[in-house]
Amino acid sequence: MSAYRFRRAHRLLKTDEFSSVFSLRQQRSNAFFQVFARPNGLDHARVGLVVGKKVAKRAVRRNYIKRCVREWFRLNQQGLDGVDYVVRAKTAFTREQRAEAVTALQALFAKLARCRASSSS
């Protein structure tokens, strides 16, 4: 079985799950994304995505943004154990800006990891 699958268990699906991550308010943001984090007590990370109509009016664009974030999470989930993340898009990006947006997302997750490491030690 591949370690790079994005199973249902790795997704935040219910309103309560999203609310619990938002209530902790451990977050970092940049021009493209705002990422909220909360320890979940599981052996794997979970992710939830929020892309509003104010960010991207067309569903095609919103789905593209979510697809890009899901793909990044799928490929990098091994290093993100035991945390629930909610990724909120702040700005829509085009295919030409995808690499820049993914780099920005990587930087936010790295900042949150450093923050969690410093607060736990």
Curated annotation (Swiss-Prot):
Family annotation (SUPFAM superfamilies): Ribosomal protein S5 domain 2-like
Entry GO MF terms: 3'-tRNA processing endoribonuclease activity; ribonuclease P activity; tRNA binding
Organism per entry: Chromobacterium violaceum (strain ATCC 12472 / DSM 30191 / JCM 1249 / CCUG 213 / NBRC 12614 / NCIMB 9131 / NCTC 9757 / MK)
The name this protein goes by in its record: Ribonuclease P protein component
Stored Pfam families: Ribonuclease_P
Keywords: Endonuclease, Hydrolase, Nuclease, RNA-binding, tRNA processing
Keyword Cell inner membrane included in the entry's annotation: no
Nuclease in keyword set: yes
